[in-house]
Amino acid sequence: MQVEYEYTYMDRELRIDRICNASKRKSVKVLDLTQMELMAPKGSHHLDHYMNNGGKFFDFSRGYPDTEELKTYMICFSGERYLISVTDDFLNAMRITLSHKIKLQ
């Protein structure tokens, strides 16, 4: 089974849909990013505190190494962490309203 994720960012909300075999779509999560504590690239030192605290972990990334077009970022909330793959354009759109919570390194 081939699984892909699609992200929609609007009004400080991130909607995540799962697409199975390029035909079935299901909404899996809606994140209120005003409650987000931090968003940083996977492996960033900014995430050390969150990685050591445990909590629930959800992987909504594409599952492949980063490319020039897609980068893997972790979104941290109190007690929950989400892994997503985003383009620079998508990240820049989020940074317009949430720049103080998004780290680029």
What is each residue range found by the language model?
Residues 42-50, 98-105:
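Short, surface-exposed secondary-structure junctions/capping segments
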Residues 18, 25-30, 94-97:
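A short, polar/proline- and glycine-enriched secondary-structure boundary/capping micro-motif
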Residues 1-2, 19:
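Transmembrane alpha-helices and immediately adjacent membrane-cytoplasm interface residues
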Residues 26-34, 82-88:
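Short amphipathic beta-strand/extended segments with alternating polar/hydrophobic composition
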Residues 28-49:
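Structured surface patches comprising rigid loops and adjacent beta-strands/short helices at the edges
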Residues 4-6:
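Short, surface-exposed charged micro-motifs
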Residues 8-25:
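Membrane-cytosol interface motif
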Residues 55-105:
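A membrane-cytosol interface segment of integral membrane proteins
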